[in-house]
Amino acid sequence: MNKPVHNNEHRRKRFNKKCPFVSAGWKTIDYKDVETLKKFITERGKVLPRRITGVSSRFQGVLSQAIKRARHLGLLPFVGED
């Protein structure tokens, strides 16, 4: 009998992403560190999801609060720059 052929194109490769903040030993994220915050937002100014950045759930909440504070104080734009 013929064995079923598996289509490997549809399989996803799983990567173990480590949280960049945990691996660097960060305790908190500073809202004034704009260069770090810019790495976690899109060109349009949206916060990147955890599945893309690999940030832990604890730091994702802290990160989004820091981005919101920086936006409110005018350090980051609400909408991406053209």
Curated annotation (Swiss-Prot):
GO cellular component, one term: cytosolic small ribosomal subunit
GO molecular function: small ribosomal subunit rRNA binding; structural constituent of ribosome
Biological process according to GO: translation
Highest taxon above the source species: Bacteria
Transmembrane segments: none
Keyword tags: Ribonucleoprotein, Ribosomal protein, RNA-binding, rRNA-binding
InterPro entries: Ribosomal_bS18 (IPR001648), Ribosomal_bS18_CS (IPR018275), Ribosomal_bS18_sf (IPR036870)
Function: Binds as a heterodimer with protein bS6 to the central domain of the 16S rRNA, where it helps stabilize the platform of the 30S subunit.
Record PANTHER family: 30S RIBOSOMAL PROTEIN S18, SMALL RIBOSOMAL SUBUNIT PROTEIN BS18M
Quaternary assembly: Part of the 30S ribosomal subunit. Forms a tight heterodimer with protein bS6.
Family to which this protein belongs: Belongs to the bacterial ribosomal protein bS18 family.
NCBIfam families named among the record's database cross-references: S18
The protein's name in its UniProt record: Small ribosomal subunit protein bS18
Annotated organism of origin: Chlamydia pneumoniae
